[in-house]
Amino acid sequence: MVITLVGEKLAKPGLEFIYYGPGEPCKTCRLARVCIGNLEPGRRYKIVRVRNIEHPCPLHEGKVRVVEVVEPAIEVLMEPRYAIVGSKIKLSFVECNDDDKAELVRPEGLFEGDLVKILEIVDDVECGGRKYKLVKVMREKG
């Protein structure tokens, strides 16, 4: 669980977002350490709890709220031989040039080489004549 700040209009349990890095006003903000200091650029986060604390923010149209976030499970295509529920593997993206499947091939929030735990096999997917497994994974830290 990570504590961070999000714009009050976005502060809703269940909302997912990608953190892309600090905005210009963040570089001099006194709350930057708690707001962006706990987030990794390029990672996906899901709000699990909104606390009743708010702060002024020049970036988020007035105010930000304190929230608790986690990295959610993410769906990704994988070679069938690696798709074993419960196993932990180093993520290797598959080759698939179908634009409709781009978000499953290289989903935002995951990077090549991440250590992930396979939680569930969701579906079988074909791309370019090859068969892959669509799996739900959770990134393992450290």
Curated annotation (Swiss-Prot):
InterPro entries: UPF0179. It comes from the Archaea. It comes from Pyrococcus horikoshii (strain ATCC 700860 / DSM 12428 / JCM 9974 / NBRC 100139 / OT-3). This is UPF0179 protein PH1477. Belongs to the UPF0179 family. Pfam families: UPF0179.
